[in-house]
Amino acid sequence: MAAAPPLSKAEYLKRYLSGADAGVDRGSESGRKRRKKRPKPGGAGGKGMRIVDDDVSWTAISTTKLEKEEEEDDGDLPVVAEFVDERPEEVKQMEAFRSSAKWKLLGGHNEDLPSNRHFRHDTPDSSPRRVRHGTPDPSPRKDRHDTPDPSPRRARHDTPDPSPLRGARHDSDTSPPRRIRHDSSDTSPPRRARHDSPDPSPPRRPQHNSSGASPRRVRHDSPDPSPPRRARHGSSDISSPRRVHNNSPDTSRRTLGSSDTQQLRRARHDSPDLAPNVTYSLPRTKSGKAPERASSKTSPHWKESGASHLSFPKNSKYEYDPDISPPRKKQAKSHFGDKKQLDSKGDCQKATDSDLSSPRHKQSPGHQDSDSDLSPPRNRPRHRSSDSDLSPPRRRQRTKSSDSDLSPPRRSQPPGKKAAHMYSGAKTGLVLTDIQREQQELKEQDQETMAFEAEFQYAETVFRDKSGRKRNLKLERLEQRRKAEKDSERDELYAQWGKGLAQSRQQQQNVEDAMKEMQKPLARYIDDEDLDRMLREQEREGDPMANFIKKNKAKENKNKKVRPRYSGPAPPPNRFNIWPGYRWDGVDRSNGFEQKRFARLASKKAVEELAYKWSVEDM
């Protein structure tokens, strides 16, 4: 077999690219064929030329080419920080649950899936049971989780459930088959659970089309901390799960078709909840028997009239009930209607600590059932109406002997007694003469007092001095005002004298001169009269005309009286700069205090100047 001619890289790439364009899916097969048909070096030994074929597989070429392209593109792309998933763990688990194919989701992919519908899973088979499609029931259904169910847990009933109200079905047996446990032979309908929480959706209506099954409702009191029990596969209880407190046969159950013609009891509303057919909690008995049946008060009177009444109770949605007022307090015929009742077995019926509902109004022993009925007494009307009377209970008139009225006692006058006093204060009835005279005297004294008060109500107050004479306040006020004025004038005069008359006059003259100068323009010229007069009157030393000026002044002031003034040598300075009298002979007769003061001021000023010069010496 002849050796295949060697291929150049360009031809090899051309063949490879044409093969890639023809079909990508056949790339692996062609690669294998090429590897099988790889040209072998011809001959053994050193004959001819040894060709080393740089055969690279198409996968390696494609990856290297893509890596090169990615490296080239990465230079143009912006740098992005690494994405860090900071979502909570619940959201991640929910996303993993939805994205995985292990679970079969029912309905829409919303987060409310666990609370939409619940199915019973009694076997390991995870396929859902048959769903009821008889009525558009979007409310949550309870499911049995006897096996480890990986589905999300159902929502509790003590949380607000926004599901709408169900309409009751009035057909005798037209509903689709119920969901029945596969390991149970119980034919009784599911019991209605009680929800004391603000759940707007009422519980499902039990269907009473089964023979010999009375409508039992299981109470779910919210104060009861015990969780609902789950029945097991091997449970001997073949009835649907109910919450009971005794294992003995329940003697309080009664079929509707029995000869007993008693009405179904109506439980009173503990709260103004108008949701139809919502049962309320009842007080438990001490003997451990728990009430198993309680009908809603909002439904009408349920009567037993034969087998035709075996259907479930009517829904108040379809029956007119005009009475939506708050619950009325029923009145008992006996004085002990509100006291605690003792049945024939001596069981004192009280509300236990776990049952926090308000106690019901107990009826008298005459209205209670037989000893076999261990359910708590219900509120009943005092007069049993006929079977045709379906009207709501009327408001009963209050009897005088009823102790059930919890309102406080009224303040009323005892019968046969009238008010002892009238509005004016006088006594009623026959009054003795002494009492009448005393009342008259008191009335006269009151009238005199009132007249005296009216007379001196606006009178002026009379003030007297120590001797008892009346004081004229107006004159006293005038005298005080005059005296104050005189004192103020004298104080001003003494203040003026204390400051000095000459100083005050000079100060006043200076103020006048300053006001006059303020009226003149800012620039004064040579032709200013005041300025020329002031310069002429000045005496200058060495002036040859000084004597002539003095003579002229003396002639001008000859007719004017001028006080003589000291004209000798300069006197020593004083604090007030006062000149001595014209008769002073020039001898200093002081103790030298003024001289010392001026010397002290001069030395202080010299020291300050020397200190300043020393501080700025180096500058």
From Swiss-Prot:
One of its GO terms (biological process) is mRNA splicing, via spliceosome. Pfam families: Bud13. It comes from the Eukaryota. GO terms for molecular function: RNA binding. It is found in: Nucleus. The modification Phosphotyrosine is found at residue 494. Residues 109-128, 139-160, 289-306, 335-353 have a biased composition (Basic and acidic residues). There is a cross-link at residue 65 (Glycyl lysine isopeptide (Lys-Gly) (interchain with G-Cter in SUMO2)). Residues 404-415 have a biased composition (Low complexity). The modification Phosphothreonine is found at residues 123, 135, 147, 159. Residues 433-520 form a coiled coil. The modification Phosphoserine is found at residues 28, 127, 139, 151, 163, 172, 175, 197, 201, 214, 222, 226, 235-236, 240, 248, 258-259, 271, 281, 325, 354, 357-358, 391, 407, 567. Part of the activated spliceosome B/catalytic step 1 spliceosome, one of the forms of the spliceosome which has a well-formed active site but still cannot catalyze the branching reaction and is composed of at least 52 proteins, the U2, U5 and U6 snRNAs and the pre-mRNA. Component of the minor spliceosome, which splices U12-type introns. Belongs to the CWC26 family. Involved in pre-mRNA splicing as component of the activated spliceosome. As a component of the minor spliceosome, involved in the splicing of U12-type introns in pre-mRNAs. PANTHER family: BUD13 HOMOLOG. This is BUD13 homolog. The gene is BUD13.
